[in-house]
């Protein structure tokens, strides 16, 4: 029961902060639990660690921005709290399977 409250609180914090450069440690601290407790709770109830949940939210927004805006990759990475566009592009490619540019190009080709 308590674990579910922590997960819900974490997801709410992710929604509030996914455009900021926050760390898992920061969110765990705000919830009043350790990083290992947060990761254990996330793995148990959501099937993935806290950082992956945070990245999934950022990538969801990135896909939305790639689809509906003409923002550059640099602007997007900055908006989503990445310190470097290279880190954003690397994460996007690793999780989505293609680069942000290729994702946008594919969308344009389908229209």
Predicted regions, residues:
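Terminal helix-turn-helix DNA-binding modules in bacterial transcription factors
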Residues: 44-89, 105-111
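Short hydrophobic/aromatic patch on the recognition helix
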Residues: 38, 87-88, 92
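Basic, amphipathic alpha-helical hairpins
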Residues: 9-23, 42, 46, 63-72, ...
């Amino acid at each position: 029961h308590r674990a579910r409250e922590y997960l819900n609180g974490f997801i709410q914090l992710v929604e509030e902060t996914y455009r900021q450069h926050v760390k898992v440690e920061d969110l765990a601290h705000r919830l009043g639990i350790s990083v290992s407790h947060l990761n254990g709770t996330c793995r148990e109830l959501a099937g993935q660690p806290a950082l992956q949940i945070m990245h999934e939210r950022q990538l969801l927004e990135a896909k939305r921005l790639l689809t509906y805006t003409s923002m550059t990759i640099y602007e997007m990475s900055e908006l989503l709290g990445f310190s470097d566009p290279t880190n954003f592009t690397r994460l996007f490619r690793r999780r989505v399977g293609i680069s942000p540019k290729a994702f946008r190009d594919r969308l344009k080709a389908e229209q």
